[in-house]
Swiss-Prot record:
Pathway: Protein modification; lipoprotein biosynthesis (diacylglyceryl transfer). InterPro entries: Lgt. It comes from Nitrosomonas europaea (strain ATCC 19718 / CIP 103999 / KCTC 2705 / NBRC 14298). It is an enzyme of class 2 (transferase). The lineage of its organism: Bacteria, Pseudomonadati, Pseudomonadota, Betaproteobacteria, Nitrosomonadales. Its main location: membrane. The keyword GTP-binding does not apply. This is Phosphatidylglycerol--prolipoprotein diacylglyceryl transferase.
Length: 278
């Protein structure tokens, strides 16, 4: 049996300014997004993405993650609490972000980016999908440091007692999600996108992969409260939200290979001088 280290949630404190580990994990995720994105641009000199677009994608994506992730948590998991404490919605530094809400927020943000640059929405999402998983993994490390989103009671040797739960050893499900939704998903999507794929295929594969890994990890994670209750039909809130994601990913993957859409056909060509700015 293990005991959670009970980290200080504040990583850096300078006078009244306190920087939390949870926020640093988000910063790490955004930094990895830029570094990996620049690498992909160098590897695809004739692609539709430029460094200027990548910087814009980060800006749009940050807004989508924060707004969508927070609103998703409020609506999907704790609507009753936030109706009684509406100002707490703004306290994002205390944690409480929903991946599925953030996913919808980023999808809308990338639609705005695609319209700005007159590109296919799927051409944009295909490019950024491989850049996302490591950031998701960093977020799960932030959850572990905070001692939140712990797993179900277990008798496995690595069961861990968390400070804000009862004294029962539990699965460190945050670390399971870090491994699967972060490292494994990154490796799969990065390798899959290394070769030319039909338009929308990389996005569809990401949706299937994340939804499947999240659904699997939910069997070890303590179910969250939500507007559907803790468990409905034996399915947790995270699984309910992942099932349509998997279904949409399968449909998108089928469409991509059925019609063999090509990014160069769906995306309007950028001027040569814009392409060569990298």
């Amino acid at each position: 049996m293990l005991v959670h280290p009970q980290f200080d949630p504040v990583a850096i404190s300078i006078g009244p300014l306190a920087v939390r580990w949870y926020g640093l994990m988000y910063l790490l995720g955004f930094s990895l997004f830029i570094l990996l994105g620049r690498y992909r641009i160098r590897q695809q000199p004739n692609g539709v993405f430029t460094r200027e677009m990548l910087d814009d994608a980060l800006f749009y994506g940050v807004l989508g993650v924060i707004l969508g992730g927070r609103l998703g948590h409020v609506l999907f998991y704790e609507p009753g609490y936030y109706l009684q404490h509406p100002l707490e919605i703004l306290a994002i530094w205390q944690g409480g972000m929903s991946f599925h809400g953030g996913f919808l927020g980023v999808a809308i943000a990338m639609l705005c980016l695609a319209r700005k640059y007159q590109l296919s929405w799927l051409a944009v999402t295909d490019f950024i999908a491989p850049l996302v998983p490591l950031g998701l993994g960093a977020g799960r490390i932030g959850n572990f440091i905070n001692g939140e989103l712990w797993g179900r009671p277990t008798d496995v040797p690595w069961g861990m007692i968390f400070p804000y739960a009862d004294n029962l050893p539990r699965h460190p499900s945050q670390l399971y999600e870090f491994a699967l939704e972060g490292l494994v998903l990154f490796a799969l999507i990065w390798l899959y996108s290394a070769k030319p794929r039909p338009l929308g295929a990389v996005t569809g594969m990401f949706m299937i992969g994340y939804g499947a890994f999240r659904s699997f990890c939910e069997f070890f994670r303590e179910p969250d409260d939500g507007f559907l209750g803790i468990m409905t039909l034996g399915i947790s809130m995270g699984q309910w939200l992942s099932l349509p994601m998997i279904a949409a990913g399968i449909a998108l993957l089928y469409w991509a290979y059925r019609y063999d859409g090509k990014p160069e056909k769906a995306a309007r060509k950028l001027p040569r001088e814009r392409k060569n700015r990298d």
